[in-house]
Swiss-Prot record:
It comes from the Bacteria. InterPro entries: UPF0210. PANTHER family: UPF0210 PROTEIN MJ1665, UPF0210 PROTEIN SPR0218. Pfam families: DUF711 (PF05167). Belongs to the UPF0210 family. Disulfide bonds: none annotated. This is UPF0210 protein Blon_2054/BLIJ_2131. Homodimer.
Length: 454
């Protein structure tokens, strides 16, 4: 039974502590849209998305109005397009046509982003998957809200180094084609290892082939709520600290569960999962970095940062998992540099380095995220970053990812501005010592010995 104090507390979390539902994401299967003609495939895709998602935005706004809970984004994920377009796309330009169809359909229904222009190549690439990857520079530079991801490895299969090597060149090409906008195209692309099928967040969201015809997934956000709660834990021991984070994560996730079930009921589409992630914004007081600093660090990046993040991530999961019948996606604490005020400050001061961020990815929910690097960084160096992150994910049986932006025409210390939720970031140095002979060997890195569980 709710009491009036709990109602007041929830209101305070929304009004003063920036609690919001970051996204309601509708996943839609496009497997039945495939044909042997690319124009017909595009028509099928457009028709299915605009039919299934026609009420998504209005329903999100109605739930916002009825419950007083801010819902920041409404999004769509679709089946990886490398699968949908495999029979009809004979060139990279054919895949770009599908990207335009996705962009047009998403704009028609009014969503903020659409994800799933993706390929799953953790062992090797089919001809269609390679065509899609090679189409990325044109697709991401010519569309506005289409997001893309490529899964290059997994604990079970190892790492596809041919794909990793290719992606270094692709990311450079995307950066050059969108140079007039601080290489914004790279914001819409992420390389994964152990990618989840049900991620509601972008740019890595897609509708997995193990999913049904359509599903509603919800991502919550509440670093500001956790930060405010930690004011009461100042000077207390770790037991008190952990309990505070856990209880707060439970309350945050309960809000997401309510929104997910209500959206599912109103849209007549099954509820999938709640993603428990703490997703920051560039606004003051809505920062994962601030939470880490309240745990006891002078600034993010100081010794102890990785341990503090590991503890935060674990307590968020432990608290959140009790508040929802189904959890999934990435679920943990995000560390996107450009989207987090305190991390922006730490990177600007030099306290938070790329190497420290890599260490933090061993224990956070994803990986190297929204990091601006010099525009003259080589393709092989970017491939090396992807390989390092994929190795961390593969060996530790966790999801890792790389979303770096080599900002064309800018160097260390300059600022890149991506706007809105994507924020802004100082360009940080990257070790330029060559790894080209390593990433160009070809083939794949085998799966680790502990992957053999059968």
């Amino acid at each position: 039974m709710l009491n009036i104090m709990e109602v007041h507390e929830t209101n305070q979390m929304i009004e003063q502590e920036k609690l919001d539902v970051r996204t309601i994401t509708m996943g839609i299967s496009l497997l039945d849209c495939a044909s042997d003609d690319v124009d017909k495939t595009c028509d099928n895709i457009y028709r299915k998305i605009t039919t299934y998602a026609k009420d998504l935005v209005s329903t999100g706004k109605a739930i916002e109005r009825d419950y007083g809970i801010p819902i920041v984004n409404k999004r769509i994920t679709v089946t990886p397009i490398s699968l949908v377009g495999a029979s009809s796309c004979k060139t990279s330009e054919d895949f770009v046509k599908i990207a335009h169809a996705l962009d047009k359909a998403a704009k028609e229904v009014g969503v903020d982003l659409i994800g799933g222009y993706s390929a799953l190549v953790s062992k090797s690439m089919t001809p269609a998957e390679e065509l899609l990857i090679r189409s990325l520079p044109q697709a991401l530079s010519e569309t506005d809200i289409v997001c893309s991801s490529v899964n290059v490895g997994s604990t079970k299969t190892g790492i596809d180094m041919n794909a990793v090597e290719l992606l270094g060149h692709i990311i450079k090409d995307v950066a050059e084609r969108t140079a007039d906008n601080d290489s914004y195209g790279c914001v819409k692309f992420v390389a994964f290892c152990n990618v989840p099928d049900d991620n509601p967040f972008m740019a890595g969201g897609f509708h997995g082939v193990t999913e049904g015809d359509a599903v509603i997934n919800v991502g919550v956000s509440g670093p500001g709520v956790v930060s405010r709660a930690l004011d009461a834990a100042k000077g207390k021991d770790f037991e008190f600290l952990c309990e505070t984070i856990k209880r707060t994560a439970f309350k945050i996730t309960r809000v997401g569960q309510l929104v997910a079930q209500e959206a599912s009921r109103r849209l007549g589409i099954p509820f999938g999962i709640i993603d428990l992630s703490l997703a920051p914004t560039p606004a003051v007081g809505d920062s994962v970095g601030e939470v880490l600093e309240k745990i006891g660090l002078e600034q993010v990046g100081a010794p102890g940062t990785t341990a503090a993040l590991a503890m935060l991530n674990d307590q968020v999961k432990k608290g959140g998992i009790m508040a929802s019948s189904y959890v999934g996606g990435l679920s943990g604490a995000f560390i996107p540099v450009s989207e987090d005020k305190n991390m922006i400050d730490a990177a600007s001061s030099g306290c938070l380095t790329l190497e420290k961020l890599e260490a933090m990815t061993c224990v956070c929910s994803v990986g190297l995220d929204m990091i601006a690097i010099p525009g003259d960084t080589s393709a092989s160096t970017i491939s090396g970053l992807i390989a390092d992150e994929a190795a961390i994910g593969m060996v530790n049986q966790k999801t890792t990812a790389v979303r770096v932006i080599p900002v064309e025409g800018k160097g260390v210390g300059e600022m890149a501005n991506f706007g809105g939720l994507m924020g802004y970031a100082p360009i940080i140095p990257v070790n330029q010592t060559s790894c080209e002979a390593f990433v160009t060997r070809g083939g794949r890195i085998p799966a680790p010995i502990h992957s053999f569980k059968n």
